[in-house]
Regions:
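Short, conserved loop/helix-junction motifs that constitute active-site signature segments
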Residues: 79-85, 121, 145-147
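NAD(P)+-binding Rossmann beta1-loop-alpha1 motif at the extreme N-terminus of oxidoreductases
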Residues: 1-44
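Rossmann-fold NAD(P)-binding glycine/threonine-rich loop
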Residues: 91-144
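Rossmann-like NAD(P)-binding element
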Residues: 45-101
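Short, well-ordered alpha-helix to beta-strand connector turns
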Residues: 23, 60-62, 124
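Active-site-lining helix/loop region of Rossmann-like oxidoreductase modules
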Residues: 148-216
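General beta-strand structural signal in soluble alpha/beta enzymes
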Residues: 51, 125-129, 178-180
Length: 216
């Protein structure tokens, strides 16, 4: 699969490296394809990765993965061009520092970042996934000592094909994908990301932790 990852920072780079190891072709969509942030991941991935300006990456990819900061999204969506029929996996979170210095969600509970992206990206098919953990857990999804229990990857979408792609890409990383419903469920997944961030950043925990699902 040709995966166009928009953004080559910590998250985009970690996803790109791991998916390349699983046999996918990675295209980083960035403002500066020659230098900047793409050099480290390109150097590590090798021939199965390339970098292009954002609209070219969008045209070349079978699926688009958004791995940019949330506040860049309006400009990024504009730069992506025609998105009709395209599948977009939104990995972003609308998290910001409020006036008290606490991490908060900027959109409240009446909508979500994923729904706003779907509104901006006319005609695109949007899924929310790969947003509930820090990048470290996508660089390496192995957690010894838990037997056959795999970390879970919660996702949501209104589109069946988008769901199938997320399922495959999650399994390729070593996760157990768990569908939570339509795109409106991003209103629950984004607060879950906020909880993870508060625990990892504000409570000083090691960021190498994920959610598991115990069944009986």
């Amino acid at each position: 699969m040709k995966i166009a990852i928009i953004g080559a920072g910590n998250l985009g780079g970690a996803l790109g490296r791991s998916w390349a190891k699983a046999g996918h072709t990675i295209i980083f969509g960035v403002r500066d394809p020659v230098g900047g942030k793409t050099k480290p991941p390109l150097g590590e991935i090798g021939a199965s990765a390339s970098s292009m300006v954002v609209p070219d990456a969008v045209r070349s990819g079978d699926v688009i993965v958004l791995a940019t900061p949330w506040d860049a999204i309006p400009d990024v969506i504009t730069a992506m061009g025609d998105l009709r029929g395209k599948i977009i996996i939104d990995c972003t979170n609308p998290i910001f520092l409020n006036a008290e210095g606490s991490l908060s969600l900027s959109l409240g509970s009446s909508t979500s970042g994923a729904e706003e992206i779907a509104r901006l990206a006319t005609g695109a098919r949007v899924a929310k996934a790969f947003n509930t953990y820090g990048w470290e857990n996508f660089a390496d999804a192995s957690y010894p000592g838990y037997g056959d229990l795999k970390p879970v990857l919660f996702y949501c979408s209104d589109d069946d094909e988008a769901k199938e792609i997320v399922e495959k890409l999650a399994k390729d990383l070593g996760y157990e994908p768990v569908e939570t419903g339509g795109l409106g469920m991003a209103r629950s997944l984004e607060p879950l990301a906020l909880l993870w961030t508060r625990l990892a950043v504000r409570r000083g925990r090691n960021p190498n932790f994920v959610w598991g699902m115990m069944k009986r």
